[in-house]
Amino acid sequence: MADGDKTIEISLDRSRIDLEYCYDFIAASYWAAGRTRGEFDRSVEMSFPLGAYCDGRQVGFARVVSDQIAIAYVADVFVDPDYRRMGIAAKMIDALHNHPELKRVKRWLLATADMQPLYRLHGYADLDDMMMMRLDEDARNRDPLR
């Protein structure tokens, strides 16, 4: 896949993920500020991650938490600021939807403060009065994983 003069590759190979690079980005994000490295590593271990690469360098990341049948939750999606507006996030979302372990999932969920237009293009709709969510605000006060 080429975007201009850059070759973008999306890989499901978790061994290629640069955990330090991804953690540095995610720990500074609005959605995961304060997440410890141990918590991040565990979240990657317990999910279906993928990486986006440009000429071998990681430039994006996303992961899905799922039971592989009923539900999948898309999390920690990011693209390096220097590589945005190249369609990388869209390619990552497509790759997650086509992940061989997630093909039977019926409900896909996510939370975002700023990327609703992208996700709407991939079939996501704003939640209606049928969906509910519980937020445990005390979770952040529990002892973190190290």
Task: Kindly give the residue locations of the regions a language model identified.
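A conserved beta-strand-loop-helix scaffold within acyl/acetyltransferase catalytic domains
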Residues: 38-78
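Acidic/histidine-enriched, beta-strand-rich ligand/metal-binding domains
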Residues: 75, 82-84, 102, 118
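Conserved acetyl-CoA pyrophosphate-binding loop and the N-cap/start of the following alpha-helix
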Residues: 83-92
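Conserved active-site alpha-helix within GNAT-family acetyltransferase domains
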Residues: 102-137
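Acidic/histidine-enriched, glycine/proline-rich intrinsically disordered or flexible terminal extensions
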Residues: 138-146
